[in-house]
């Protein structure tokens, strides 16, 4: 049977987001992407149907923000702001977490699950080490506290998240919590 011409593929598949494999046995750095949006009932986290968060292999020659934007596009979301919010060591690799603030999706791809975000206590370690466990709810809490600070301190973030100001007012910016309320 003759092979179809390359310009007329039988099935068009999207290429991989990165060429770096993601595997629990692969020691490397990886990106964690938290897609979030604001709805009348509060914040929502869009996660892959197969996992708590989206994890993407991150080759050292690529800019992480570009990889995150490719993921936003892949899941057919409309970005508002993409920002690195935290990092941690876990599962034998460095995990850099990005929060991707997106518009509420009109039609959600069947590859994503939509979950309402609840408040959580932050994971805290001791003076010489990280917390023994860090859950997704704690990473999201940290991300919203980080954005609550940036929306007031960074003009670009403040402009892009102006519609989020009322929601973010509920979060005490993390750098100032130690000084007491309203510091």
Regions inferred by a protein language model and the residue ranges of each:
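Conserved Nudix-box catalytic region and its N-terminal flanking loop in Nudix hydrolases
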Residues: 2, 22, 26-80, 86-93, ...
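Actinobacteria-biased recognition of intrinsically disordered, low-complexity terminal regions
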Residues: 1-29, 37-39, 176, 180-183
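Nudix hydrolase/Nudix homology domain
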Residues: 45-56, 88-183
């Amino acid at each position: 049977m003759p092979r179809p011409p390359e310009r007329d593929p039988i099935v068009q598949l999207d290429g991989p987001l990165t060429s770096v494999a993601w595997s629990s046995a692969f020691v490397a750095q990886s990106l964690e992407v938290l897609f979030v949006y604001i709805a009348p009932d509060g914040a929502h986290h869009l996660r892959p149907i197969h996992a708590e968060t989206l994890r993407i292999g991150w080759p050292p020659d690529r800019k992480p923000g570009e990889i995150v934007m490719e993921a936003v596009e892949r899941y057919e979301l409309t970005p508002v702001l993409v920002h690195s919010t935290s990092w941690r060591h876990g599962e034998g690799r460095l995990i850099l977490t990005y929060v991707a603030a997106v518009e509420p999706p009109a039609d959600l791809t069947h590859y994503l699950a939509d979950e309402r975000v609840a408040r959580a206590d932050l994971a805290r370690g001791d003076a010489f080490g990280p917390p023994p466990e860090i859950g997704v709810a704690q990473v999201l809490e940290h991300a919203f506290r980080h954005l609550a600070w940036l929306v007031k301190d960074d003009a670009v973030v403040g402009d892009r998240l102006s519609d989020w100001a009322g929601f973010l007012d509920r979060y005490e910016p993390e750098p100032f919590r130690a000084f007491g309320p309203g510091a």
